[in-house]
């Protein structure tokens, strides 16, 4: 792919990509657990698999319930930026959950509507979830615990402009994770990701140092090449 080997992390994949150039996790037919979106994705809560504990990623805390766990208030982490320079804030979180709730062609829609009554913006960095019943396992359900989650936060200023998010490929995705798409094989055999110039404003840069112990002079691989 033309990158220096000492700057490139190579990841072997088990199968080719079914829809080359498709980087929208909510497009119909997407397999959420395949892994090709993970370097770009943003989630309310991530998982430290070594410690066996969840921690806030897009969220700034583990959420605050009311007395009977029918309402959850979640603070959103300040300082995160999308790769186009826009701030990631409550608008993106509210939009993502309502997009899922309101679109029955999204796989997680039915389960989301089963438990969540409404999602509201309190202020630019606070979101309130009203549940349909007592729901104490909120962070486990809507964050990562094992392989991933159906709830990946998308940029409201991009996805709100799409007529149908389930047919939108998102070939040049705006992301909150540390890597953007540099190139991909039109036959689906490989994808090349590049570290954002502003990766310190990504989920890894803002959150990762607290959980993975790297220092300011340590920089992730410039490129990651997923190949079949």
Question: PLM features: what roles do these ranges have?
Answer:
Residues 38, 46-50, 145-223:
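Gly/Pro-rich hinge or "lid" segments in bacterial periplasmic/extracellular proteins
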Residues 114, 174, 226-228:
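Short helix-initiation/N-cap motifs at beta->coil->alpha
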Residues 17-27, 52-55, 137-140, 189-192, ...:
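Short, solvent-exposed loop/turn elements at domain surfaces
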Residues 5-16, 71-74, 96, 127-129, ...:
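Short, well-ordered beta-strand elements
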Residues 109-161, 178-185:
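Surface-exposed binding/hinge segments that line
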Residues 61-106, 122, 128:
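Aromatic- and charge-enriched surface segment that lines or borders ligand/interaction sites
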Residues 10-67, 98, 174:
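N-terminal lobe/hinge region of extracytoplasmic solute-binding protein
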Residues 1-6, 117-118:
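Short, low-complexity disordered leader/linker segments with a strong preference
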């Amino acid at each position: 792919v033309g990158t220096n080997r000492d700057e490139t992390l190579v990841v072997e994949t088990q199968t080719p990509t079914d829809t080359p150039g498709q980087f929208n996790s909510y497009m119909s037919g997407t397999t959420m657990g395949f892994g090709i979106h993970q370097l770009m994705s943003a989630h309310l809560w991530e998982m430290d698999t070594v410690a066996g504990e969840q921690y806030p990623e897009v969220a700034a805390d583990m959420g605050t319930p009311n007395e009977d766990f029918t309402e959850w208030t979640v603070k959103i982490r300040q300082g995160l930026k999308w790769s186009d320079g826009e701030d990631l804030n409550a608008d993106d979180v509210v939009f993502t959950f309502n997009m899922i709730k309101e679109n029955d062609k999204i796989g997680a829609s039915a389960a989301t509507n089963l438990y969540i009554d409404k999602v509201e913006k309190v202020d630019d960095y606070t979101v309130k979830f009203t549940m349909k019943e007592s729901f104490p396992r909120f962070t486990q359900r809507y964050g990562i615990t094992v392989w991933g989650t159906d709830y990946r936060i998308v940029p409201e200023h991009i996805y709100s402009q799409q007529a149908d998010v389930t047919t939108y490929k998102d070939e040049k995705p705006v992301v909150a994770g540390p890597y953007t798409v540099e190139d991909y094989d039109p036959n689906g055999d490989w994808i090349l990701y590049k570290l954002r110039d502003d990766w310190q404003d990504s989920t890894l840069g803002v959150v990762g140092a607290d959980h993975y112990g790297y220092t300011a002079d340590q920089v992730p691989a410039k490129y990651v090449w997923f190949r079949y």
